[in-house]
Amino acid sequence: MQAKYSSTRDMLDDDDTTISLYSGTSTVTRRAEPRHSENGTPSSVWRPVALTLLTLCLVLLVGLAALGLVFFQFYQLSNIQQDSITEKDEKLGNMSRQLQSLQAQNRKLIETLQQVAVKLCRELYNKSGGHRCSPCPEKWKWYGDKCYQFYKESKNWQSCEYFCLADNATMLKISTQEELDFAMPQSYSEFFYSYWTGLSRNGSGKAWLWTDGTPYSFELFEIIIDPTNLRNRDCMTIFNGKAYSKDCKELRRCACERIAGRVVPGELQ
């Protein structure tokens, strides 16, 4: 075997050799070389992980900051929009109240204008015995808020009722003093013509009712009844300013009435 060292000097020059002087013999020992772990030191392993976590934390913080900024902007925008909506609601409420006030004033002006037109038209109508401003059909008489027609045709009571209905009217009704003052003078005739009214009863002793179902007022006028006549006298006529109970099958003239229309201001000229 070939010796590792050719001389003592060579052995001394070797850093890996140690001489023991205490034992009196030369003992050569080799310094153990440091072993490196295959996986490296712990610090070298955790450093990338820590950097990654730190990066993620920074990204998360930036995201939270951006989200907070967006939320703050949205909150400000929401408050601005809410204030704008509230302001618009207040303006809309004020405009609505103003519109209602203007509509009320407009209705009042229209009513006033209509009252003036009716008054003027009535003066023209009464002065000339008729005028184109009249709210009644041609040949109908205008009194109060109604139109009246006293026909010359003679029919029984039931036929007169149908006759009036066909003309968009009803049989004459006298329920106020004003209507009585107007209707009775129309009944004066030199030829004994009387007019059926809408008052009748369903047999002797029963209540007198108008065609609309309202009761007859005994205080307004008296119905003259002939107790000696055996025939049923359950329908009322007017003749020479008085009311009479007559047989409903007798032939009398028809008196009809209807609600007057509106006076057209343009027809006052």
Curated annotation (Swiss-Prot):
Spans within the Cytoplasmic topological domain: 1-51
Source superkingdom: Eukaryota
Pfam families reported in the protein's UniProt record: Lectin_C
InterPro entries for this protein: C-type_lectin-like, C-type_lectin-like/link_sf, C-type_Lectin_Domain_Fam1, CTDL_fold, NKR-like_CTLD
Entry keyword Hydrolase: no
Membrane-protein topology: Single-pass type II membrane protein
Locations listed in the record: Membrane
Glycosylated residues in this chain: N94, N126, N168, N202
SS bond list: C164-C256, C235-C248
Residues in compartment: Extracellular: 73-269
One GO location term (cellular component): membrane
Keywords associated with the record: Disulfide bond, Glycoprotein, Lectin, Membrane, Signal-anchor, Transmembrane, Transmembrane helix
Protein name: C-type lectin domain family 1 member A
Organism: Mus musculus
